[in-house]
């Protein structure tokens, strides 16, 4: 190895350079937007980090026309509690089709705290392994097809997207790495918005 470095100009691969990133930078950058969030069918995604130290809240909007939008709404240490998150979600029950919540620590408590408000069947979703793989595919496909955008000032979401790696899961893969929590929450929100049959924004017409 030392000889190769000195004589041949060869260096051992650096992990950061060879890591199997989940989202190519050029594809992510092509979906950046400076336009404000559109109106449309809305869902929220909540992801507790693997070590339980952080929680990310994201939203996704699918308008009648044009690309969907994903947004990082908040990212906080779980040491601050989750009362703020439960209150925030309960205040917006009438505006969203669903909230998708995933993680090991904090999920049960959050679901319990919003249960009295989020009563509609299917409004609170706890994704299975299959759902997590599907949510990842939903976001990556949307990025590849340029059918989703993200706001250019969302640096935390940007950093998460560009540093997340592919993590094997149940025969497929999902987002992984030390900073994947925001992009995971975004994928859950978009998947929820696309698959939920509930849409509070639509007024039923009779006759």
Where do the language-model regions lie?
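C-terminal nuclease/phosphodiesterase catalytic domains that cleave nucleic-acid phosphodiester bonds
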Residues: 6-10, 14, 58-59, 109, ...
